[in-house]
């Protein structure tokens, strides 16, 4: 099986809580902190970087897949993840680059059973060169709307991953200016990155190729990997909420507006984790 060496000594853990954010030059105090977590395999990052600068063609660029989970539910966070797979594993799903790897069953998380997603989740974490998972709480969704919350999550997952990469390449006395990165966002639009902040780390806008991939989670392995991280991490928060509020049946509907969920809201009321800006919740509060 084609797998990477992976030891704990190579791993840098990443944890951030974002309470204030710069959006187009304006600082906004978030209604609730955005939590981000992840890790980087420093040894594999350096190996991929060396391959990156040894090849001048665009196909050698470091590829970051980005996807979200949970835009539609009435309850809980929207989760976003970014993931970097080994370059030999990163490409079109139809090319079967993962055929002989531990991630051979990886495809769009929506096409996989929950059992397979749960199986893939730790494997993606283990074999990814790096990943970041963001949890954007309902209060922030209500503050800036679900689209902007999703775009902000995509932006933060990308920027923090690039920031950590830049710091460690600079620490290893590597020329960061030779790094070329393709960021592949699932969907039909890309978030606006804070290029001013990235430039302070040595990452120029010309070094980043942002691409929007419609149905990218079913087309590209790196986006599919991010999809697994986002989906399973959100499911975990739903199961935790279900333990706290079993009467709502959250483990079954995961916060989506099913009949059972709407009946639970009518019977037991609106939870603090409900998205008050969403029409069904807003109507329940008004009634």
UniProtKB/Swiss-Prot annotation:
Keywords of this entry: Cytoplasm, Endonuclease, Hydrolase, Manganese, Metal-binding, Nuclease
UniProt keyword Oxidoreductase present: no
UniProt xrefs under InterPro entries: RNase_HII, RNase_HII/HIII, RNase_HII/HIII_dom, RNaseH-like_sf, RNaseH_sf
A molecular function GO annotation: RNA-DNA hybrid ribonuclease activity
Cofactor binding summary note: Manganese or magnesium. Binds 1 divalent metal ion per monomer in the absence of substrate. May bind a second metal ion after substrate binding.
Binding-site list for a divalent metal cation: 67-68, 186
GO process annotations (BP): DNA replication, removal of RNA primer; mismatch repair
Alphabetical list of Gene3D superfamilies matching this protein: Ribonuclease H-like superfamily/Ribonuclease H
GO cellular component: cytoplasm; ribonuclease H2 complex
Stretches that traverse the bilayer: none
Places the protein is found: Cytoplasm
Entry similarity comment: Belongs to the RNase HII family.
Role this protein plays: Endonuclease that specifically degrades the RNA of RNA-DNA hybrids.
UniProt protein name: Ribonuclease HII
Species per Swiss-Prot/TrEMBL record: Psychrobacter arcticus (strain DSM 17307 / VKM B-2377 / 273-4)
């Amino acid at each position: 099986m084609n797998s990477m060496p992976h030891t704990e000594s190579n791993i840098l853990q990443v944890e951030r809580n974002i309470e204030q954010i710069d959006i187009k030059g304006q600082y906004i105090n978030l209604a609730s902190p955005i939590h981000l977590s992840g890790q980087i395999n420093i040894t594999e990052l350096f190996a991929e970087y060396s391959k990156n600068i040894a090849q001048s063609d665009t196909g050698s660029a470091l590829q970051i897949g980005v996807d979200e989970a949970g835009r539609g539910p009435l309850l809980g966070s929207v989760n976003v993840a970014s993931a970097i797979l080994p370059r030999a594993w990163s490409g079109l799903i139809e090319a079967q680059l993962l055929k002989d790897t531990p991630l051979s069953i990886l495809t769009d998380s929506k096409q996989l059973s929950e059992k397979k997603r749960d199986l893939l989740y730790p494997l993606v974490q283990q074999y990814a060169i790096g990943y970041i998972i963001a949890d954007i709480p309902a209060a922030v969704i209500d503050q800036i709307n679900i689209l902007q919350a999703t775009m902000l999550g995509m932006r933060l997952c990308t920027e923090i991953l690039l920031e950590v990469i830049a710091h460690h390449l600079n620490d290893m006395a590597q020329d960061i200016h030779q790094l070329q990165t393709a960021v592949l966002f699932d969907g039909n639009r890309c978030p606006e990155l804070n290029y001013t902040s990235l430039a302070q780390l040595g990452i120029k806008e010309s070094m980043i190729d942002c691409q929007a991939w419609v149905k990218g989670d079913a087309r590209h392995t790196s986006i599919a990997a991010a999809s697994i991280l986002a989906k399973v991490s959100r499911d975990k928060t739903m199961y935790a909420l279900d333990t706290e509020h079993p009467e709502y049946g959250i483990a079954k509907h995961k916060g989506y507006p099913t009949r059972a969920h709407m009946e639970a809201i009518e019977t037991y009321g609106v939870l603090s984790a409900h998205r008050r800006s969403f029409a069904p919740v807003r109507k329940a509060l008004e009634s």
